[in-house]
């Protein structure tokens, strides 16, 4: 389900330990086998409610291609917790409040503001900080190229420029400009029961730290895959795997490190309007450029947790 292979690199990398990769792949393989077994005989028969599944948030950090029907409005609170760095205690939680509007079945705009809380003590290379801050504001434009109901898979392009006021990792006051470009694809594997998604993302950022005046230019390249199975009406459970690579420079210039995350996902709807989704990602393998360590906790965190709640109108 998930393949890790990047051929261009600025530094030589050692191979991931075979055990780590096995642990990363095993949960998704098991999810596929359980889904296929429990849905034996269902292939080729479209469930009555299959057309009602909105896949955008059923996969966790990975996202589906759906953007809502023309005229649909959505309000959403999306909280992401980042935990675990070497040398001390590292805990941050960022909550984005977002409003979305679908102008057509193929185009949607949204705007959001993100507030973050930092609780950092004794972490190597990061100043101690315990405070809340306005982290960023942004807007997101999504263009759906293929509708899953009329094509072999759904495909949506997303562009999200943002203006930041605090460094995402350290919380230090900053002037930040960046954008995230994403390709979101999904497919219905077993009608009404099992869905799969695949994402590619590229996020360049320029950050000027107000305290020191230092300017940082960096970029992140990500690839992710996920499965979600409807285990009862309006309730989905699944698993996802993501590989994130950090670079120094806006154009993927110098490789800095990478992390492989895996974890479970959950999604449920309540009535016709309300939904909740949750995901937990654990870094099971990573590598800092030039290091022999088994994780990259310089550029990434050990644990990522996401909780979304929203309403559609």
Language-model segment annotations:
Residues 1-22:
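N-terminal secretory signal peptides that target proteins for export/translocation
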Residues 22-36:
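Bacterial N-terminal signal peptides
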Residues 41-313:
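Transmembrane beta-barrel domains of Gram-negative outer membranes and organellar outer membranes
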């Amino acid at each position: 389900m998930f393949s890790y292979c990047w051929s261009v690199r600025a530094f030589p990398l050692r191979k991931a330990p075979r055990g780590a990769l096995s642990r990363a792949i095993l949960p998704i393989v098991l999810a596929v086998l359980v889904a296929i077994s429990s849905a034996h005989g269902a292939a080729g028969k479209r469930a009555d409610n299959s057309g009602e599944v909105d896949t955008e948030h059923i996969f966790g950090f990975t996202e589906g291609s759906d953007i809502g029907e023309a005229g649909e409005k959505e309000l959403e609170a999306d909280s992401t917790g980042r935990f675990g760095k070497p040398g001390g205690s590292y805990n941050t939680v960022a909550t984005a409040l977002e409003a979305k509007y679908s102008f057509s079945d193929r185009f949607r705009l949204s705007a959001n503001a993100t507030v973050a809380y930092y609780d950092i003590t004794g972490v190597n290379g990061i100043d101690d900080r315990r405070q809340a801050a306005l982290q960023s504001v942004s807007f997101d434009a999504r263009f759906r190229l293929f509708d899953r109901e009329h094509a072999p898979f759904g495909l949506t392009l997303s562009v999200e420029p943002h203006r930041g006021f605090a460094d995402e990792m350290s919380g230090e006051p900053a002037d930040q400009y960046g954008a995230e470009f994403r390709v979101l694809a999904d497919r219905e594997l077993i009608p009404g029961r099992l869905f799969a998604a695949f994402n590619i993302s590229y996020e360049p950022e320029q950050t000027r730290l107000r305290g020191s005046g230092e300017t940082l230019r960096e970029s992140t390249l990500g690839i992710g895959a996920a499965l979600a199975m409807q285990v009862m009406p309006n309730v989905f459970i699944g698993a996802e795997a993501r590989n994130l690579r950090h670079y120094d420079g806006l154009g993927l210039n110098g490789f800095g490190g990478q992390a492989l995350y895996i974890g479970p996902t959950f999604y449920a709807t309540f009535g016709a309007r309300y939904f909740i989704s949750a995901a937990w990602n654990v870094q099971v393998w990573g590598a800092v450029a030039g290091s022999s360590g088994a994780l990259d906790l310089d550029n990434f965190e050990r644990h990522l947790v996401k909780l979304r709640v929203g309403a559609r109108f």
